Amino acid sequence: MANDFLFTSESVSEGHPDKVADQISDAVLDAILAQDKYARVAAETLCNTGLVVLAGEITTTANVDYIQVARDTIKRIGYDNTEYGIDYKGCAVLVAYDKQSPDIAQGVDRASDDYLNQGAGDQGLMFGYACDETPELMPFPIYYSHRLVERQSQLRRDGRLPWLRPDAKSQVTVRYVDGRPHSVDTVVLSTQHAPDITQAQIREAVIEEIIKPVLPPEMLKDTKYLVNPTGRFVIGGPQGDCGLTGRKIIVDTYGGASPHGGGAFSGKDPSKVDRSAAYAARYVAKNVVAAGLARQCQVQVSYAIGVARPINVTVYTEGTGKISDAKIAELVQEHFDLRPKGIVQMLDLLRPIYEKTAAYGHFGREEPEFSWEATDKAAILRAAAGL
């Protein structure tokens, strides 16, 4: 990529229909893990006007009221009025869970290459990424896209902007000069709103109360603001669009700054490497950058179903590494256990911590439960690299 360019990332709020689905799926997962930490869960959700459908594969000893979990999640998000198109009290919730296939279970329960360890729950490839564009070691565009819709939610919940409704989207376009963020070129923010507010009022409030308090002022240089550019956003959430689990995988990760292996996260227990290995790859990449081994780091891992050890662990630092990418990859394999069971132990993943991940990004958030955001291996890596 050229050194001078524009790059865009987007995010969506907790009230976006796809995020409603993600949060319900992860709330179901958490409710199960709270009772049965070894459960196998693949919980999918569809939500539309007045309707929630829960489907997938679950094998567990837990006794969970799935319908109540779905209603509680919808209530927490803020869909508590029939005028919003879905109401936690009155919506229909259909449950259609099956059990995990025994053909899959036999490979996960016992790995074909290591009988003392758990095999991967599926084949696949996963990526982790980190860079020094923000203190959280995340790309600037996706980090601030998340913070914008998070701010929208805060102002809706605390009543400062009472006409806001749960659904919102943000998009941040950043101008890079010499490969570094230089300024914010364009901000798009679309927010659902009450019908009796004017476009002029929305625009002023969004720019002054949401955008400017979030974005660094030194980055706002001739920035273009596009606020509700269609002119009206009253119908939103699951009424405006059907929501599905796993439809916001780029929002969930790095906003397009890194490749994505294609596997979604929400609703999946840690035996699914789509989720756990992507978290581990972020943990690896963040520690590499925190150690000063590179300014940016992309990690790819891949697995075969029923096999514990990753097929490959590949590191790419885009020319920013202090040592070779191959040497960093060697250090990664020496200091991180990337077998599925090793990941679960390393990051303490058998906990009901996942609903919080399902909105505003799985990465780049300093939450106490987000063990994959720790940089506790940075000093070890730095010493091992001889820096």
Swiss-Prot record:
Its EC number is 2.5.1.6. It catalyses: L-methionine + ATP + H2O = S-adenosyl-L-methionine + phosphate + diphosphate. Binds 2 divalent ions per subunit. Binds 1 potassium ion per subunit. Mg(2+) binds at residue 18. Residues 100-110 are annotated as: Flexible loop. The keyword Transferase applies. The gene is metK. This is S-adenosylmethionine synthase. The keyword Metal-binding applies. Disulfide bonds: none annotated. It is an enzyme of class 2 (transferase). K(+) binds at residue 44. Pathway: Amino-acid biosynthesis; S-adenosyl-L-methionine biosynthesis; S-adenosyl-L-methionine from L-methionine: step 1/1. ATP binds at residues 16, 167-169, 232-233, 241, 247-248, 264, 268. Belongs to the AdoMet synthase family. L-methionine binds at residues 57, 100, 241, 272. Keywords: ATP-binding, Cytoplasm, Magnesium, Metal-binding, Nucleotide-binding, One-carbon metabolism, Potassium, Transferase. Its cofactor is Mg(2+); K(+). GO terms for molecular function: ATP binding; magnesium ion binding; methionine adenosyltransferase activity. HAMAP family: S_AdoMet_synth1 (MF_00086). One of its GO terms (biological process) is one-carbon metabolic process. PROSITE patterns: ADOMET_SYNTHASE_1 (PS00376), ADOMET_SYNTHASE_2 (PS00377). PANTHER family: S-ADENOSYLMETHIONINE SYNTHETASE (PTHR11964). Catalyzes the formation of S-adenosylmethionine (AdoMet) from methionine and ATP. The overall synthetic reaction is composed of two sequential steps, AdoMet formation and the subsequent tripolyphosphate hydrolysis which occurs prior to release of AdoMet from the enzyme. It is found in: Cytoplasm. The lineage of its organism: Bacteria, Pseudomonadati, Pseudomonadota, Betaproteobacteria, Burkholderiales.
